[in-house]
C-alpha cells in the first residue's frame, strides 16, 4: 500500500445541535473545533443539524426543522 494517502481515522464527537445530543465515535471528518468530553480528554467536534436523535423517522415525532428559512421563503413565494 502507498504511504500517506489514507485519511486520519480518529476519535470524534458529533453534536446534534437540534436535540443537543452528543456521541463519541471514530471518523475521518476534519474540524478545527474541539470539546472536552466526559473522560476529561479533548476531542474534535463536528456539529450536525440532524441525526437519529432528532430525525422524525427515528423519534416518531413530526416536527419541522428549518435551519435556513426555506419554508418561509417557499410560503411567501407561493402564497395565494
UniProtKB/Swiss-Prot annotation:
A Gene Ontology cellular component where this protein is annotated is: ribosome
Protein family (similarity comment): Belongs to the bacterial ribosomal protein bL31 family. Type B subfamily.
A Gene Ontology biological process noted in the UniProt record is: translation
Q: Which UniProt keywords apply?
A: Ribonucleoprotein, Ribosomal protein
Q: Which organism is it from?
A: Stenotrophomonas maltophilia (strain R551-3)
Tell me the protein's name: Large ribosomal subunit protein bL31B
Give the top-rank taxon of the lineage listed in the UniProt record for this protein: Bacteria
Q: Which PANTHER family match?
A: 50S RIBOSOMAL PROTEIN L31, CHLOROPLASTIC, LARGE RIBOSOMAL SUBUNIT PROTEIN BL31A
| A Pfam family per the record | Ribosomal_L31
Amino acid at each position: 500500500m502507498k504511504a500517506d494517502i489514507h485519511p486520519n481515522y480518529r476519535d470524534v464527537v458529533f453534536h446534534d445541535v437540534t436535540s443537543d445530543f452528543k456521541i463519541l465515535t471514530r471518523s475521518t471528518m476534519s474540524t478545527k473545533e474541539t470539546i472536552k468530553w466526559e473522560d476529561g480528554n479533548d476531542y474534535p467536534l463536528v456539529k450536525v443539524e440532524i441525526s437519529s436523535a432528532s430525525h422524525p423517522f427515528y423519534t416518531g415525532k413530526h416536527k419541522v426543522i428549518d435551519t435556513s428559512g426555506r419554508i418561509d421563503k417557499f410560503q411567501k413565494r407561493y402564497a395565494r
